[in-house]
Amino acid sequence: YGRRRHPKKLTPLAYKQFIPNVAEKTLGASGRYEGKITRNSERFKELTPNYNPDIIFKDEENTVMNQWPGVKLRVTEGWDEDGHHFEESLHYEGRAVDITTSDRDNSKYGTLSRLAVEAGF
């Protein structure tokens, strides 16, 4: 049977570092822009809301809790319709998310970014 992998050392991302190292709206990072989703569009029905006040963010592996016990992942913005992002922002499609930690300790953001990359975001 398979052997258990040793967890690899997580290197925090540097400020303004991207994985992949390309802009958010390039094909290599996120695919083609599919168009803004409005509340009245059919695609809006495909978005999955989270109304549970006890859940800040889905973290099945508890990576944030394992890294920083007692700290939760905090989503500050997901799908958006307010027009405060650039025209083809992935926030308008529900494909971008802005995250922080519940303690708002910005010294954790590099490692948080790495955890997001490792989780497939």
From Swiss-Prot:
<dbReference type="GO" id="GO:0007417">
    <property type="term" value="P:central nervous system development"/>
</dbReference>
<keyword id="KW-0378">Hydrolase</keyword>
<dbReference type="GO" id="GO:0005509">
    <property type="term" value="F:calcium ion binding"/>
</dbReference>
<dbReference type="GO" id="GO:0005615">
    <property type="term" value="C:extracellular space"/>
</dbReference>
<keyword id="KW-0479">Metal-binding</keyword>
<protein>
    <recommendedName>
        <fullName>Sonic hedgehog protein</fullName>
    </recommendedName>
</protein>
<dbReference type="GO" id="GO:0008233">
    <property type="term" value="F:peptidase activity"/>
</dbReference>
<dbReference type="GO" id="GO:0006508">
    <property type="term" value="P:proteolysis"/>
</dbReference>
<feature type="binding site">
    <location>
        <position position="61"/>
    </location>
    <ligand>
        <name>Ca(2+) 2</name>
    </ligand>
</feature>
<feature type="binding site">
    <location>
        <position position="76"/>
    </location>
    <ligand>
        <name>Ca(2+) 1</name>
    </ligand>
</feature>
<dbReference type="InterPro" id="IPR001657">
    <property type="entry name" value="Hedgehog"/>
</dbReference>
<keyword id="KW-0068">Autocatalytic cleavage</keyword>
<feature type="binding site">
    <location>
        <position position="61"/>
    </location>
    <ligand>
        <name>Ca(2+) 1</name>
    </ligand>
</feature>
<keyword id="KW-0564">Palmitate</keyword>
<dbReference type="GO" id="GO:0048468">
    <property type="term" value="P:cell development"/>
</dbReference>
<feature type="binding site">
    <location>
        <position position="80"/>
    </location>
    <ligand>
        <name>Ca(2+) 2</name>
    </ligand>
</feature>
<keyword id="KW-0862">Zinc</keyword>
<keyword id="KW-0645">Protease</keyword>
<dbReference type="GO" id="GO:0009888">
    <property type="term" value="P:tissue development"/>
</dbReference>
<feature type="binding site">
    <location>
        <position position="91"/>
    </location>
    <ligand>
        <name>Zn(2+)</name>
    </ligand>
</feature>
<dbReference type="GO" id="GO:0001708">
    <property type="term" value="P:cell fate specification"/>
</dbReference>
<keyword id="KW-0106">Calcium</keyword>
<comment type="similarity">
    <text>Belongs to the hedgehog family.</text>
</comment>
<dbReference type="InterPro" id="IPR000320">
    <property type="entry name" value="Hedgehog_signalling_dom"/>
</dbReference>
<keyword id="KW-0964">Secreted</keyword>
<feature type="binding site">
    <location>
        <position position="77"/>
    </location>
    <ligand>
        <name>Ca(2+) 2</name>
    </ligand>
</feature>
<dbReference type="GO" id="GO:0007224">
    <property type="term" value="P:smoothened signaling pathway"/>
</dbReference>
<keyword id="KW-0449">Lipoprotein</keyword>
<dbReference type="GO" id="GO:0007267">
    <property type="term" value="P:cell-cell signaling"/>
</dbReference>
<keyword id="KW-0217">Developmental protein</keyword>
<feature type="binding site">
    <location>
        <position position="98"/>
    </location>
    <ligand>
        <name>Zn(2+)</name>
    </ligand>
</feature>
<dbReference type="InterPro" id="IPR009045">
    <property type="entry name" value="Hedgehog_sig/DD-Pept_Zn-bd_sf"/>
</dbReference>
<feature type="binding site">
    <location>
        <position position="77"/>
    </location>
    <ligand>
        <name>Ca(2+) 1</name>
    </ligand>
</feature>
<comment type="function">
    <text>Intercellular signal essential for a variety of patterning events during development. Signal produced by the notochord that induces somite patterning, dorso-ventral patterning of the brain and early patterning of the developing eyes. Displays floor plate-inducing activity. Binds to the patched (PTC) receptor, which functions in association with smoothened (SMO), to activate the transcription of target genes. In the absence of SHH, PTC represses the constitutive signaling activity of SMO.</text>
</comment>
<dbReference type="InterPro" id="IPR050387">
    <property type="entry name" value="Hedgehog_Signaling"/>
</dbReference>
<keyword id="KW-0472">Membrane</keyword>
<feature type="binding site">
    <location>
        <position position="82"/>
    </location>
    <ligand>
        <name>Ca(2+) 2</name>
    </ligand>
</feature>
<feature type="binding site">
    <location>
        <position position="60"/>
    </location>
    <ligand>
        <name>Ca(2+) 1</name>
    </ligand>
</feature>
<dbReference type="GO" id="GO:0005113">
    <property type="term" value="F:patched binding"/>
</dbReference>
<dbReference type="Pfam" id="PF01085">
    <property type="entry name" value="HH_signal"/>
</dbReference>
<comment type="subunit">
    <text>N-product is active as a multimer.</text>
</comment>
<dbReference type="GO" id="GO:0030182">
    <property type="term" value="P:neuron differentiation"/>
</dbReference>
